Curated annotation (Swiss-Prot):
S-adenosyl-L-methionine binds at residues 69, 90, 116-117. Belongs to the class I-like SAM-binding methyltransferase superfamily. MenG/UbiE family. Its EC number is 2.1.1.163, 2.1.1.201. The keyword Cell membrane does not apply. It comes from Ralstonia pickettii (strain 12J). PROSITE patterns: SAM_MT_UBIE (PS51608), UBIE_1 (PS01183), UBIE_2 (PS01184). HAMAP family: MenG_UbiE_methyltr (MF_01813). GO terms for biological process: aerobic respiration; menaquinone biosynthetic process; methylation. GO terms for molecular function: 2-methoxy-6-polyprenyl-1,4-benzoquinol methyltransferase activity; demethylmenaquinone methyltransferase activity. Pathway: Quinol/quinone metabolism; menaquinone biosynthesis; menaquinol from 1,4-dihydroxy-2-naphthoate: step 2/2; Cofactor biosynthesis; ubiquinone biosynthesis. It holds the Pfam family Ubie_methyltran. Methyltransferase required for the conversion of demethylmenaquinol (DMKH2) to menaquinol (MKH2) and the conversion of 2-polyprenyl-6-methoxy-1,4-benzoquinol (DDMQH2) to 2-polyprenyl-3-methyl-6-methoxy-1,4-benzoquinol (DMQH2). This is Ubiquinone/menaquinone biosynthesis C-methyltransferase UbiE. InterPro entries: SAM-dependent_MTases_sf, UbiE/COQ5_MeTrFase, UbiE/COQ5_MeTrFase_CS.
Amino acid sequence: MSQTHFGFQQVDEQEKAGKVAGVFHSVASKYDVMNDLMSGGLHRVWKMFTIAQAAVRPGYKVLDIAGGTGDLAKAFARQAGPTGEVWLTDINESMLRVGRDRLLDAGVLTPTALCDAEHIPFPNAYFDVVTVAFGLRNMTHKDRALAEMRRVVKPGGKVMVLEFSKVWQPLEKAYDVYSFKVLPWLGSKVAGDPESYRYLAESIRMHPDQETLKQMMEQAGLDSVEYFNLTAGVVALHVGRRL
């Protein structure tokens, strides 16, 4: 059986899916609070930048993969309006439930679905925009997921990946201390779960850097791939098009 990484561990591919699911079942109820604490609220700025780059218009069809608690889907649904179609999807039932409830509380009615990004249950060339924010690094076969995103986006449409990336080199040591000391401590104090947040820090380090992810998106069949470094490369937004 093929091996893959779960944080810094090597595990069977089938085992990884269960382990990742366990992490997000555990953190779902505290996910938004922890995001604010871990990023100092910057995750909201990164998402606002992504929303601006997506440039969703009335009538657009948008797929938000690994949409979690629904920040992007909520904004897209308001932009696409009643003639549009915005799907909030996630492979994790606990995260999807939190996201669906948050959308309802905000008065946003949009469809939700459990969705494995490696097997997206939508037809070819269906969406104008496909997004995944802070989800790609948890996927076992990133190449398959990217190919599926390319498949379901329309010609001329965008595939957008917002993800933690390779930080500017002078900041690496400080960033390591924060990631491997502060994050697990916050996870313990706020969520009672240091191990899940240790995994999140490790998964960031194992994720491809900016140029490698750009090449992966190109290999998946996307064109005109570019990326934007945010907060000194702590996060990068990659954007590719299907021509």
